[in-house]
Amino acid sequence: MAKTKAVIPGSFDPITYGHIDIIERSAGRFDELHICVLKNSNKTGTFNIDERMALIEESVKHLSNVEVHNYNGLLVDFCDKIGAQTIIRGLRAVSDFEYELRLTSMNKKLNSNVETMYMMTSTNYSFISSSVVKEVAQYKADISDFVPPNVEKALKEKFKK
């Protein structure tokens, strides 16, 4: 039987416990889970792609079926390249759905063989976003409930002044 492969795309700038929640829950449902770090042209990154990948790899090293990649192109092309049939998208709130629906519709039009599945973030992480974590970190507040220790350390270094 063919291995089931899924992709979780995102900018992960930086990875948060909300992301990790979706990754851990997805890892148990697929033979291979591929984290794809994409450049978001609408956002200026705090961490470069290599830094983000290193932070993710450290944060998910306990998951043996998870691989971290970066890709500069269309997500559906990446799915084709690795043979993934499924894209996993995390939703924090209903407000995320409209944007995600547009992405899903475009991806489906570009490649009808790839399905998108939505997973609700666990309630205790539903308010966390990378942007909010970075904003709080800039003010030297405690972010240990929102990100793994390696990410907390990296953010403190970025915002040290």
Swiss-Prot record:
Main location: cytoplasm
Residues the entry annotates as binding ATP: S11, F12, H19, G90, L91, R92, E100, Y125, S126, F127, I128, S129, S130, S131
UniProt organism field: Staphylococcus haemolyticus (strain JCSC1435)
NCBIfam families in the cross-refs: coaD_prev_kdtB, cyt_tran_rel
Annotated pathway: Cofactor biosynthesis; coenzyme A biosynthesis; CoA from (R)-pantothenate: step 4/5
Subunit structure: Homohexamer.
Cofactor(s) needed by this chain: Mg(2+)
Assigned protein family: Belongs to the bacterial CoaD family.
UniProt keyword Nucleotide-binding, yes or no: yes
Name recorded for this polypeptide: Phosphopantetheine adenylyltransferase
EC number: 2.7.7.3
Gene: coaD
Residues binding substrate, per UniProt: S11, K43, L75, R89
Cystines in this chain: none
Function: Reversibly transfers an adenylyl group from ATP to 4'-phosphopantetheine, yielding dephospho-CoA (dPCoA) and pyrophosphate.
Residues of the site described as Transition state stabilizer: H19
Gene Ontology biological process terms from the UniProt entry: coenzyme A biosynthetic process
